[in-house]
Structure formats: C-alpha cells, structure tokens
Amino acid sequence: MKIKWEDSDGREFSIKVISREFEWSSIAGDKIRYNRSGRVKEIGPVYIKYNRGGWVKEVGSVYIKYNRAGWVKEVGNLYIKYNRAGQVKETTGTVN
C-alpha cells in the first residue's frame, strides 16, 4: 500500500507502508539539497528529516511514525492498522 499526499504548492510525496520506499516530485524552480549521506534533505522549502535508521520521519509538517516491525503506522493524522499477517486491515483519518 502506498500513501500519497501533496503540499499546498503541488509537490507530491508518497511512502510505501511495508518497504518504507519514499518518493517525491518537485515543481519548477525548486532547488533540491542533499545531506552528507546523499539523501534528499530539502525540496524547495520542504525539509525532509530522517531517523537513526535512515527512514523518513518528517516531510515538512507531516510526521511519519513506525511500529516495532518497521512498518508505517502513522502519516500525519492518518493511522494504519495491520493484521497478524502484516496486511493493512484498516486506515482512519487523513494525512493533513
């Protein structure tokens, strides 16, 4: 499952709940900056922050939280619940 959202200027962001694969798009004129590890740290005015494991933990004002298994459990105000097999069984709320 992929969770997608966009900021007020039209930049799109997404994260896959199990693999934690993070994707983004920029708009014309955006400068892309990278951290020492080579990860994107800024897309225009949007800052990207990572946890110690290298997983995205914040995109602008949207926080991303993980469960013990390392699966995404929250993206902003969107909550994700899994069954014992690791499949998404329920989502509630919205990202923003």
Region locations from a protein language model:
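Repetitive, compositionally biased segments used for assembly/scaffolding
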Residues: 1-96
